[in-house]
Amino acid sequence: MTLNKLRKKYIDFFKSKKHFEIMGKSLVPENDPTVLFNTAGMQPLIPYLLGEVHPSGDMLVNVQKCLRTGDIDEVGDLSHLTFFEMLGNWSLGAYFKEYSVKCSFEFLTSSDYLNIPKDSLYVSVFEGDQEIPRDTETAKVWESLGISKDRIHYLSKDHNFWGPVGSKGPCGPDTEIYVDTGKSKCSLDCNITCSCGKYFEIWNNVFMQYNKDENGNYIELGRKCVDTGMGLERTIAFLQGKSSVYDTDAFMPIIKRIEYISGKIYGQKEDDDRCIRIISDHVKAACFILADSSVVFPSNLGQGYVLRRLIRRSIRYAKKLGIKSHFLADLVDSVEAIYRSFYNELTEKKDFIKKELSKEEEKFFKTLSQGEQEFIKITRNLPSKTIPGDIAFKLYDTYGFPYEVTEELAIEYGFNVDKLGFNEHFKKHQKTSKKGGDKVFKGGLADYTYETTKLHTATHLLHKALQLVLGDHVRQKGSNITAERLRFDFVHSEKMTDDEIKKVEEIVNLQIKNSLSVKKIIMELSEAREKGAMALFGEKYDDLVSVYEIDGFSLEVCGGPHVENTNELGTFKIQKEQSSSSGIRRIKAILIDE
């Protein structure tokens, strides 16, 4: 069984059970600013689990890319991952506990699918408490399928209950499925709650059975849902008889390439193995972030900071392996080869990924050299073994040293870091930057005069023209439009050439000359996205949105206002193209009446 075969078998099985396959979402949540990345398969489907009607029906199956940053420091052991895939099937009121459990059991044990002996399976169910009864219903289903009572464990809310999101809302018990790896028990008390590695949790079925109200009461839901998640990497490790996810075909091609570059052999020395695992995990995660439709570049903020940290941490551990030259781009082919049959974005953006990794690598080699020298100089004169917060912040602010790198260096040299002090200086820096930013840039339209409206329409033409000239990765990151000029921030990592600027101007002016009509259409957000309408990524939209179509050229979700025809605009001229921030360019342009 391979990674790709398992993914396909899962999808095919649930499609045979009348589930509709839906596409996985972007790594970056579209309408959830509270998290940087999708961390679970159910995250993009929360609105539908909470009651919205899904356009594809009430029985769904998908594969969701996920990325968890909370455990980055744990990556390097045998199990923790930054990027992973979650296989999921969903019932939005169509079926409940019995059918869900029976489907899971069939997929796991059928000779047509995973063919796992049922005697290798262990399960947990909710033990009940004063508010919610014991989940004997699910336990009885497992018993009816041949899972003996001694392999059914009743566990507390901490283990076997999901939700609600916040203080109230839908929630319910779950049942977790474990496999026995065949390892010896670590003690007489060893069971599925033990972390010794004998038992692997591979699947979780969540049963949305209750609604918790504002008074803390649990009320039975009329429409009960099922949300399940199977970890692809953990499951394939078990099926391939491996003790670690890194020993599977999800990682070995990357590890083999690291062996070739470094001259180290995986499996010979634990310190080297840890470095190799960190590099293979982080480079894979970085490739998927760079390939994502959300368009993320390395930076010091949000998703960009996570990407930068993954890249720079890879470089730090490569140095420990003795890799002194640039190497990141050399690993991209190995990542792409593993996933090309399912994630074509890695193939389409392979050259772009290599380019961005190499650029960040070049930046960090300079930063690392200067920063390490400064670190050694500073610590040589410290009166204690604690690096003060202001010095740690200086390394960050002056040399671009992420706090985590300072912390890792500190451990190497026998120091610790005043993290609270660093955070205080960092917050002061953020406040100062925000005040300055508020003065410099205020987004949107200054007013709704005719001149401002014309420039607003010109902005739509500019947005599309930039995509045609520079590539589909171009996305609006902000705009500021007055009666005199437009200012447009967009995702692009390089300074535009004179030839590119000229081509953009020519495309915009051709659309003006062609007298294209501008129409406002009201449609559902899902329909707008299906039609390819551009939208501000991360913006929250209503179910019904206004979409402005510039006759066959541009389609964009927008509140308006706009002119009725492009022939009203005059001549478009770019006055300036410059950097706005890391990975973001800014254009200032005007319209000339002729």
UniProtKB/Swiss-Prot annotation:
Stated name of the protein: Alanine--tRNA ligase
Keyword Cytoplasm: yes
Lineage: Bacteria, Pseudomonadati, Spirochaetota, Spirochaetia, Spirochaetales
Gene responsible for this protein: alaS
Listed NCBIfam families: PRK01584.1
A Pfam family that the UniProt record links to this protein: tRNA-synt_2c
The keyword Flavoprotein belongs to this UniProt entry's keyword annotation: no
CDD domains: AlaRS_core
Assigned EC number: 6.1.1.7
Gene3D superfamilies to which the protein is assigned, alphabetical: 3.30.54.20, Bira Bifunctional Protein, Domain 2, Threonyl-trna Synthetase, Chain A, domain 2
Compartment(s) where it occurs, according to its Swiss-Prot or TrEMBL record: Cytoplasm
